[in-house]
Amino acid sequence: MSNQFVRGVCVIAILTNLFSCTQVHWSKTFQKSPLAKQSSGLVIQELNTGKIVFSHQADQFFMPASNAKLATFLMAHSFLGDSIPSFASLEKKDTLFFWGTGDPTQLNPSFKNKSLIDYLSKSTKVLVYCAPQKEIPPLGSGWSWDDYNDSYSAEISPLPLYGNLVGFSVKNQQWETVPHYFKSAILGIHSFNYVLRDRLKNEFTLPVSRSEFKVQQVPFVTSASLTAKLLADTLKKEVVIQRNAMDPLAKIQYVGLLDSLYVPMLHNSDNMIAEHLLLLIGAKNQWTGGAQEIIAKLKKESNYEFLKAARWVDGSGLSRYNLFRPMDFIEILSALHQQFGMDKLQFLLPQTGKTGTLKSIKLKSDDHVIWAKSGSFSNTYDLSGFFQNSKGKIYVFSIMTNLANHSVSESKRDVIDFLENLD
């Protein structure tokens, strides 16, 4: 037996032993963690080598909450390119037909995009807003019905305006609304300290006290009729409604970069942007329907394996019907890393102690960094992203916890504490 063969066998034995020791170490670490005492699944993988450091129930399904936005992010970048398809238009004789694409930035105070208004205001032709032939569901399947008054539950529409939110504020002891159109929809006052909308229609009651009120964003009930009225109110000219599918000859106008949508979606977990990214994908590919139909198309058109197994219902993760596996998010994150590179992902994803939903998280070691997307419901906390240890080594991970009978903040601390063992 040659010395070279013996040395080879010894190297394999040493590596096998080291791997076995690593698995034993992580198994013991996990068993000591509160994560072992609740419904949880996780994968930790070395970014550069692809080696699995530790996994537990990685092939089981969990509610992803806002981690679903990572799937939306990947699909948007794969199907949309770099720019936002803002609206579509077609001129015929004395008529200008226009279609919404789902662009969430039109007249949105956070973006100040007036491209559609500027375009329509220059025209002397009859303005016709072409609404979809089939209504797009304004709320996602499996959304909590009593969130309707909260800004994170803005409705979904083919041509969103003002972020599909009414802004209420007090100036010189007078109530103000943005857009001004909704000033006439204020019906009275109540004893609560917040603005309350009727569940089914655009009627708002206001708090009796104005002195301590600051600003509140409330979703409004969307419709094709209201879209036309809001445009007409801004343009000061009539807007006619027709229900027509987008004409193949219609030209899509591009305004702004998609990065301007990705950052608030990922940093602030903006649900409205996430939902409308799916509509943007549909509009660019001339797919009709809402989230369900577009996701069904993505499952057929995409080469990503995770789509075939996952129960993916909406773009934002608000739905309790979504079901993903930790291993799905490893695949998503790996694909994002391949497409963007680590430097760009460090900008786009929230960072512990610095940006977005992870800004308030203080890690035990100043040398540790996490760039990740969090997601939470009552009894649910998920975190998927990248962890850098004190040696500069980067891991890709997904930790999903469901059905915990304690606060979300406690689950968050359990997840972070477990990750910080990666040194």
Predicted regions and their residues:
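Bacterial Sec-dependent N-terminal signal peptides
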Residues: 1-29
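Beta-lactamase-like hydrolase cores
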Residues: 21-61, 80-83, 119-124
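Coil residues (strongly favoring Ser/Thr
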Residues: 49, 83, 94-95, 234, ...
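Active-site SXXK
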Residues: 50, 64-81, 159, 230-231, ...
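Small-residue-rich helix-loop
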Residues: 53-55, 278-423
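Short, well-structured active-site flanking segments
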Residues: 79-94, 342-346
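A small/polar active-site loop signature that marks catalytic segments
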Residues: 188-348
